[in-house]
Amino acid sequence: MALDNEAPVNSLGFAKSPAETRVVVAMSGGVDSSVVAAYLADQGYDVVGVTLQLYDHGAALAKKGACCAGIDIHDARRVAEERGFPHYVLDYENIFKDAVIDEFADSYLAGATPVPCIRCNERVKFKDLLETAKDLEADCMATGHYIQRKMGEHGPELHSAEDANRDQSYFLFSTTPEQLDFLRFPLGHLPSKDATREMAAQYGLSVADKPDSQDICFVPNGDYASVIQKLRPGAAEPGQIVHADGRVLGEHNGVIHYTIGQRRGLGIGGLSEPLYVVKLDVDQKQVIVGPKEMLATRRVPVREINWLGDAPFTSRDEWHLSVKVRSTRPPRDAIIRPISETEAEVELFSAEEGISPGQACVFYDPNGSRIYGGGWIWKGQ
């Protein structure tokens, strides 16, 4: 029997007033997280802004559009001053290097195409920062990600953003149920980024017209190879460009300069047929090229699976879901066959081109917006 004086639930799901609810907001210095902080402060919540200094490296520090570079820390602090809540900067450079940058470099050296933004969310923002938020006695942590947290029959669920063009679910598949219980995503229901900027203007935020961040924060101008060479001197060892039929077509200056599916910039012009990178043989220092049809893949082994379904992953022999194998591609119908709690074979109904080890394979409800988790692609067949 409910008591007459039972406290109403606030907008973040807590049975107490906003003033009694402490929220740590992860602030990158961009418009999205700034709007989240301003919105929650305006609603009367006890907001604490936290910005992570992740990377401080020459051009990357001053690079326009690099997440949590020097200018972004300044912008986050300024928003906190404008809206009247405390703001802290935490030095996470060593954690970020160990958990994200080193693996990024090693993955490229192994011939993979990594997605460091997922690892950053998984190992830094939603792990260490979340624990810091709890140390600050926060009730929850809010971010500016475009994704939705909805309450289901068995607890909180992860759902795609209302705006499909801004949806960041691919990059957040590794969010665990325990983390999801503590996280909040106030922007996930908005119809567009324009709505976010309108809110920023209404709050008078200095970042209202700030451009969106681009590329990977520690990779100035998208030049992956130069960053890897700095991190791993001697990584760019020359080798041969070889056709899948065995013909040697030319030389290259390092496997790190190539990715699966690449067509341009191969340095083997003058051929009658268009050729694509179909395999990177790191041991032999070879870049294997072939016709486009060689990129087509239907079977995708996946490991390090984070499962967000209600029933155990291995409770079924098959799961009929949709999957994304690249962030920019639409979900494809697939059958997921569990091998263990953290490993599976994914069979696509139709072949997909350019699937690369190191990318994520994210599981979606084929008839709705729910995300069922995902894992990491480690090879294609």
Curated annotation (Swiss-Prot):
It catalyses: S-sulfanyl-L-cysteinyl-[protein] + uridine(34) in tRNA + AH2 + ATP = 2-thiouridine(34) in tRNA + L-cysteinyl-[protein] + A + AMP + diphosphate + H(+). The active site is at 120 (nucleophile), 217 (cysteine persulfide intermediate). Pfam families: tRNA_Me_trans, tRNA_Me_trans_C, tRNA_Me_trans_M. One of its GO terms (molecular function) is ATP binding. Transmembrane segments: none annotated. Disulfide bonds join 120-217. The record marks 145, 359 as: Interaction with tRNA. Belongs to the MnmA/TRMU family. This is tRNA-specific 2-thiouridylase MnmA. It comes from Ruegeria sp. (strain TM1040).
